[in-house]
Swiss-Prot record:
This is Uncharacterized protein YbhM. GO terms for cellular component: plasma membrane. Keywords: Cell membrane, Membrane, Transmembrane, Transmembrane helix. It is found in: Cell membrane. It holds the Pfam family Bax1-I. It is a multi-pass membrane protein. InterPro entries: Bax_inhibitor_1-related (IPR006214). The lineage of its organism: Bacteria, Pseudomonadati, Pseudomonadota, Gammaproteobacteria, Enterobacterales.
Length: 237
């Protein structure tokens, strides 16, 4: 009986680890896709080089509506809808950031963050690190910072890109730490509730992380805009 219980716990742990790795993979692909969509938006001229481009305001409005809808109950969404909403959010974020920041900077920052998730996931599988542990989060943060140094040094990036890249890694590490219990809860639903398939758990987890990212990113953007506005008004006074 004890052996059966141990085997059952081991299987549960393996299922949860597989789902968490799925979340890291989808998040990695989402960040790289955001960079690609930003490039595409710029290429087909959906965005503009000035801050008051209409598409940016439309995208921000749609983002706010999506965030409000997801805040009601993100767990009621099935796998297919979660995937569609995830792609929609990626596209909206891509339009907003491409309207504010040079595309090459977006590609560097978002792709580096995506590589952090992918490499950390593979390293966790290789060295048998629990993907839901604090140790894994620390490993991911260090991996991300190492990638920032390697990529930006190789490309001889300007100082603002170095700073934004580092902040992006720290931001995602904070998001994962903040949402860790939520992700573990989602991973546990797979073997405790019939309606929760591994695919649904993984997509809902990735959508939850991106939801947190947009929220934190929006707060930081609001702070930055406030500081710029204060400096602007001081200049004219």
């Amino acid at each position: 009986m004890e052996s059966y219980s141990q085997n059952s716990n081991k299987l549960d742990f393996q299922h949860e680890a597989r789902i968490l790795n799925g979340i890291w993979l989808i998040t990695a692909l989402g960040l790289v896709a955001t960079a690609g969509l930003a490039w595409g938006a710029k290429y087909i001229e959906i965005t503009a080089t000035k801050y008051d481009s209409p598409p940016m305001y439309v995208a921000i409005g749609l983002l706010l509506l999506c965030m409000y809808g997801l805040s009601k109950d993100i767990n009621k969404i099935n796998a297919a809808i979660a995937g569609v909403i995830y792609l929609f959010l990626l596209s909206l974020v891509a339009i907003v950031v491409a309207s504010l920041v040079p595309v090459y900077a977006i590609i560097i920052v978002f792709s580096t963050a995506g590589a952090m998730f992918l490499i950390s996931m593979l390293a966790g599988l290789l060295f048998n690190v629990d993907p839901g542990s604090h140790r894994f989060i620390i490993m991911m943060t260090l991996t991300g910072l190492a990638l920032v140094i390697i990529v930006n040094a190789a490309l001889m990036s300007e100082r603002p890109i170095w700073i934004i890249s580092c902040l992006m890694i720290v931001l995602w590490s904070g998001i994962i730490s903040h949402g860790r219990n939520k992700l573990l809860e989602l991973a546990g639903k797979c073997h405790s509730e019939e309606l929760w398939s591994p695919v649904r758990c993984a997509f809902t987890g990735a959508l939850t992380l991106y939801y947190y990212f947009i929220g934190f990113f929006g707060i930081l953007a609001a702070i930055a805009i406030t500081l710029v506005w204060q400096r602007h008004t001081r200049f004219f006074h």
